[in-house]
Amino acid sequence: MLYPLSHRAKQNQICYNDYIMKLLSKKEEKKTEKEKVEERREEVLAKGRKFKYPFQWTRHRIVVNTILIALVVFAMIFIGGWLALYRIGMTDQLLFNITKVLPLSVANVDGEEVRFSDYLMLYRSSMTSIERQSGSQFDESSFEELRSEYKRSALTEAEKYAYATKLAKASDITVSQEEVAAEFDRHLKIGGIDRSEEGFIKIIENNFGLDKSEYDRMLYLTLIKAKVEMDIDTNANKIASRVETLLAENGNDYKAVADQLGDEIIYEETGGLVDSRNIDGGRASEAMKLEPGESSGRFVSMNGDGYYFVKLIKKTDSEVDFVSIKVPFTEFAKQFATLKEDGKISEYINIADPAAEIPQSE
């Protein structure tokens, strides 16, 4: 049975309840204060994230877009350059500079890549000389035919240099920078004229469109090919030795030696005084060093296609009259022709052979 609480008991109960509520209220106040701090902190961080994450996303998007644009531009440049070089056949200075930096090939000879830069260097040097000296003599149609002819010639020459490089590697034949420098110095003195390096470089720039490094490259290729030809052409070496022996036995009578050797050598007479600066494989320059009646020893032609012997007849300060015997190199040409016949030369550009387009008369 329940009894009602007395008045005093009721008051005590109320006081006790108030006390409990106060304690709970204090706890609630303390807890709320901490929560307020945490909530405020979370609010600040949330606002920061609100600006931070969109910015990070935007920056990421910019980076991705930049990379994509760069790739597209690079692809367009690559495709454009490829079309210009391999399909259109452009030969301008910009593309030439690109081929000097990038290892691009224009053909392959028996496994040896042919440098595109070598082909363009040979072609541009030939065409620059023609354009600056006699370009006005040709109409557009004739000039286009001339371009095709020189492109074919330059590509074939570049292929020969590549094959010579392959043979040089196999036989451990090298050309040093010192040899190239010595050959350059020899060119400075062609015709007995002591030119300055600066003046000579100006001449080759004006006449052939070549700078010093490109001219050195041409000298290197000529030297390496000449060394290879001397190494593999045992027949030419034997004939040259016979020429030396016969000249000694016949008192340097070039005509008598030529009669004995016949088609094995090439005998030439200038028939009078010629400019000592003639570009004739180095014969005029070599003759300028001699005295009348004196004969040179064996020397390799400046373009590396054979041995020369020269005898001076007479000379002035700037002209020479001489006779010469040439022992041509033939072995390299035979090997190169065999490669062509066997299909071991692959070309990556299409250049028609002008000689093949000439109709044969019946």
Enumerate the language-model features and the residues they cover.
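Short, low-structural-confidence N-terminal segments
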Residues: 3, 11-145, 282, 286, ...
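N-terminal targeting/tethering segments
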Residues: 16, 93-210, 214
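Subset-of-secretome marker
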Residues: 130-138, 151-152, 191, 195-207, ...
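Sec/Tat-exported extracytoplasmic proteins
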Residues: 123-130, 134, 154, 158, ...
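Peptidyl-prolyl cis-trans isomerase
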Residues: 246-286, 314-321
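Proteostasis/folding factors centered on peptidyl-prolyl cis-trans isomerases
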Residues: 199-230, 281-326
